[in-house]
Amino acid sequence: MSGGRFDFDDGGAYCGGWEGGKAHGHGLCTGPKGQGEYSGSWNFGFEVAGVYTWPSGNTFEGYWSQGKRHGLGIETKGRWLYKGEWTHGFKGRYGTRQSTSSGAKYEGTWNNGLQDGYGTETYADGGTYQGQFTNGMRHGYGVRQSVPYGMAVVVRSPLRTSLSSLRSEHSNGTVAPDSPASPAADGPALPSPAIPRGGFALSLLANAEAARAPKGGGLFPRGALLGKLRRAESRTSVGSQRSRVSFLKSDLSSGASDAASTASLGEGAEGADDAAPFEADIDATTTETYMGEWKNDKRSGFGVSERSSGLRYEGEWLDNLRHGYGCTTLPDGHREEGKYRHNVLVKGTKRRVLPLKSNKVRQKVEHSVEGAQRAAAIARQKAEIAVSRTSHARAKAEAAEQAALAANQESNIARSLARELAPDFYQPGPEYQKRRLLQEILEHSESLLEPPDRGAAGLPQPPRESPQLHERETPRPEGGPPSPAGTPPQPKRPRPGASKDGLLGPGAWNGEPSGGSGGEGSRPATPAAAGAGRRSPARPASEHMAIEALQAPPAPSREPEVALYRGYHSYAVRTAPPAPPPFEDDPQPEAADPDSAPASPATAPGQAPALGNPEPAPESPAKLEPKPIVPKAKARKTEARGLSKTGAKKKPRKEAAQAAEAEVEVEEVPNTVLICMVILLNIGLAILFVHLLT
């Protein structure tokens, strides 16, 4: 047998034994352009046993056949290590795959390089799945057993679908803690403030609406005489448990394989005794087990999920959520049964005066419970088969370790022979492994330094800034004139300067129904002085009074009586837009007054002495006045006195009567609402009595 160095046209080279024009014996070969290296034994051009090293530093140590990995061997790829059998270049039939960083692993059968058949998946926190696999996913029947809640791993990676399988190349991926959702393996991603825990898909989540509603709700308060009639409902009916806050709800789960978070967002309706416990209150020793069907790596079909605390669900599942008919048994012994939709009980939870007949629902629930129990029994059988397959895979893994030792021996012989035949021949394999080792050290050091930097730099600041920005952008009412309830009758004098160029001041349309003002917070059509000084709404009332006291009273005019007359009826503010009053369009033959203008209605001539503060010429109707005025009762007395002294004409009297009727209509609105409420109450009573009789 001859030997030497042979260079190929593609840039590769071979140095070792040669016979019949083919590599034979021991030798070392590099790939095209010197990329990759195989060192070991050869048989007429084909590898037999040795070590193949990729430029990335990944290695395979084991046996070959017809140029493909076949037999027993160990593959090191990134942070994953496979030990076991190989068939024509693919993993299988039996083998184990383990993460060198987290300890997660799979032990069982393989097909075409994927988990297929029966096996055991052990997760980073120690939780396990034993059962069937198809095309690398949990599919069929199986048992998922979690570790105690205090030891359960916190899963933050939305990229992985399993903690230890081939379904993820991002085995050590992490996402920022402020991400909207951190999916795990036992449910879809849902927004939640909680952190997912490996293997926990059930959560004792209080229903927010039920928590806010009183337990004796309905049409009557809890202390009412007839309110106690609601206690006639049965504890075993589908609709009887709707006042309890015991609904199980998957709060935060993922499309990955092992983590669903549990968090309690509500409290019980009747205090601590009826309140559902928060997830923080779960005992650290609590564990959770699921036995049933799996489809496409998710809990789907019939199954039973149970916690060591007594929480139990039997029924149908879909995509890691309770979906279909099932029964939930709470830790306190109460049961919740009915139809679930995406983890929410949709039948029997709504508050209704007439609960639906639930015979058909109970039959479907019983059927689903029986199916779940059968599925759990089958899952236990499949788990036993998986245990036997796991033990066989472990034996193959031990044999693969022996095969790897033999392959390394062949590799060392080939390297020694290559150095003898060609001392200057470059062997890239050791350099690849050194580079990979250095890269792993750097990644490990970065992973130790990254979390504190992220937490200290960017995470705490956004939550503190966002609320303040929103508060600044939120419009707030400015400080306006004092409340009409606390304003004495005298300050209504400065009305001429109250308007502000047609702009509404604070509280101009609110009306502020205080006891002393009768809701006269603003009057849209009150005339104001054209040359009066305008003031800011934020100026104190005392300052307004000081300025107004210095104003010289102009010539007597009838506009003050018009303003007072409008202020007497507050309905114009609430029912009519800011425009001239409606009674100016109704001319009367008696109202032939040369001083009246289209913007101001007819006035009573003798009211200036009663007011004691005549106002200047009128303003346009668009100018509005936010200043509160004298209470309604006093305005009415003043108006009556003025009319009696001066002998007002028929038009103001007729308009006053119409305005009074409109005011009465406005005041009768609450009576109409009260009548409607009484009618609804009677209807509810009738329905309740019919329900009790039936």
From Swiss-Prot:
UniProt feature, compositional bias: Low complexity: 176-189, 250-267, 522-540, 589-610
Marked site: Cleavage: V155, R156, L204, L205, R574, T575
Family of the protein in this entry: Belongs to the junctophilin family.
GO cellular component: junctional membrane complex; nucleus; plasma membrane; sarcoplasmic reticulum membrane
Keyword Acyltransferase: no
Gene: JPH2
Keyword entries, A-Z: Cell membrane, Developmental protein, DNA-binding, Endoplasmic reticulum, Membrane, Nucleus, Phosphoprotein, Repeat, Repressor, Sarcoplasmic reticulum, Transcription, Transcription regulation, Transmembrane, Transmembrane helix
Record region (Disordered): 164-192, 231-278, 448-663
Keyword Nucleus: yes
Coiled-coil residues: none
Domain of life of the source: Eukaryota
Modified residues annotated as Phosphothreonine in this record: T474, T487
Ranges spanned by the short sequence motif Bipartite nuclear localization signal, renumbered to the chain: 350-364
Chain ranges on the Cytoplasmic side, renumbered to this chain: 1-672
Lineage, top ranks: Eukaryota, Metazoa, Chordata, Craniata, Vertebrata
Regions of compositional bias (Basic and acidic residues) in chain numbering: 467-476
Modified positions (Phosphoserine) in chain numbering: S162, S165, S445, S447, S466, S483, S536, S542, S596, S600
Ranges annotated as spanning the membrane: 673-693
Motif segment (Nuclear localization signal): 492-496
Disulfide bonds: none
Biased composition (Polar residues): 235-244
Record protein name field: Junctophilin-2
Subunit relationships: Interacts with TRPC3. Interacts with BAG5 and HSPA8; the interaction with HSPA8 is increased in the presence of BAG5. Junctophilin-2 N-terminal fragment: Interacts with MEF2C.
Record GO terms (molecular function): DNA binding; phosphatidic acid binding; phosphatidylinositol-3,4,5-trisphosphate binding; phosphatidylinositol-3,5-bisphosphate binding; phosphatidylinositol-3-phosphate binding; phosphatidylinositol-4,5-bisphosphate binding; phosphatidylinositol-4-phosphate binding; phosphatidylinositol-5-phosphate binding
